């Protein structure tokens, strides 16, 4: 099988993952069949306007709470939102996580994602063999010195001639950093001016740029378009001046041809709110709320569960 998840393949992770080691004791042998199902369901989400007109959009959100237990939500864009809780299992403690991607080879499946644990960056993998409902969870350490980062997200552009995988990190010094990842994370630029950012997620990945959606402590909502070229020169555009200050976690999935389904989480009230966000055009961007739900799992870390080959996010 040709694997386009270049970053994690280069890190030594495969569907077998024989060289990896557990992150902590108790990290192996969870039992989350619904995580596997959530990753596979991403391939059936509407990616055209015609499909979105007849089928509801959705987003699968993984989560890890303070005890290192994994859970999450499978969310359908109805009003109010239709929410199914994902099975919980003992994982390991993480401070932040990128997207987790599901890749399949025959009857075997594996989820891959980047996580922060303490001051370290890990590439984690949960692999399922055959019909097993219990994955083996392992991780490979990619580097130390990450204690100053409080948010990470990533892009995974897998179509066309200019494929790329970038990891973005928000640092306490107020800068946004970009990394390429192989056997380690290597800097590919940074930009100051992001000290007010509270939460971020990726809404677009293309051959020439990535687009992040961020909230600020003052409640504003912005897009940050980052050309894939170096040096890193992000373009920041205001979407809304207020109304988004309570959200500490954002998770985005493609909805139709150019839109985004956004799950925003308030950690203080344990509420999740679902928004349909049209293609980002600054203050004229269409945003519709589907309402809120009680995020009863109580996690502080949320991340997208999706397929390794998409849906490709195209919302900005």
PLM features per residue range, with description:
Residues 1-29:
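Secretory targeting and sorting signals
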Residues 18-65:
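C-terminal region of N-terminal signal peptides and the immediate post-cleavage residues
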Residues 28-30, 256-316:
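Hydrophilic extracytoplasmic domains
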Residues 42-58, 85-112, 140-163, 193-209, ...:
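Repeated scaffold domains used in trafficking and secretory/extracellular systems
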Residues 127-186:
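Short N-terminal edge-element motif at the start of the domain
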């Amino acid at each position: 099988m040709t694997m386009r998840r270049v970053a994690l393949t280069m890190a030594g992770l495969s569907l077998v993952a024989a060289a990896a080691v557990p992150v902590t004791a108790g990290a192996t042998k969870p039992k989350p069949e619904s995580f596997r199902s959530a990753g596979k369901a991403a391939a059936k989400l509407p990616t055209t306007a015609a499909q979105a007109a007849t089928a509801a959009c959705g987003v699968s959100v993984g989560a890890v709470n303070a005890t290192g237990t994994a859970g999450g939500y499978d969310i359908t864009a109805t009003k109010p939102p239709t929410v199914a809780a994902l099975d919980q299992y003992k994982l390991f403690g993480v401070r932040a996580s990128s997207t987790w991607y599901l890749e399949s080879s025959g009857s075997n499946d594996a989820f891959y994602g980047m996580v922060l644990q303490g001051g370290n960056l890990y590439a984690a993998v949960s692999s399922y063999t055959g019909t097993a409902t219990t994955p083996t969870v392992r991780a490979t350490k990619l580097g130390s010195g990450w204690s100053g980062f409080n948010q990470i997200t990533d892009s995974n552009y897998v179509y066309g001639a200019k494929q790329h995988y970038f990891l973005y990190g928000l640092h306490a010094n107020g800068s946004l950093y970009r990394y390429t990842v192989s056997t380690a994370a290597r800097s590919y630029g940074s930009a100051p001016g992001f000290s007010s950012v509270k939460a971020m997620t990726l809404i677009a990945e293309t051959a020439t740029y990535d687009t992040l959606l961020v909230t600020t402590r003052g409640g504003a909502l912005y897009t940050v378009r980052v050309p894939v070229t170096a040096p890193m020169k992000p373009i920041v555009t205001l979407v809304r001046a207020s109304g988004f200050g309570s959200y500490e976690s954002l998770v985005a999935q493609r909805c139709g041809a150019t839109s985004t389904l956004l799950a925003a989480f308030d950690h203080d009230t344990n509420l999740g709110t679902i928004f349909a966000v049209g293609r980002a055009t600054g203050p004229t961007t269409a945003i519709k709320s589907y309402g809120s739900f009680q995020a009863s799992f109580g996690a502080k870390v949320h991340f997208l569960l999706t397929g390794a080959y998409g849906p490709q996010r195209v919302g900005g």
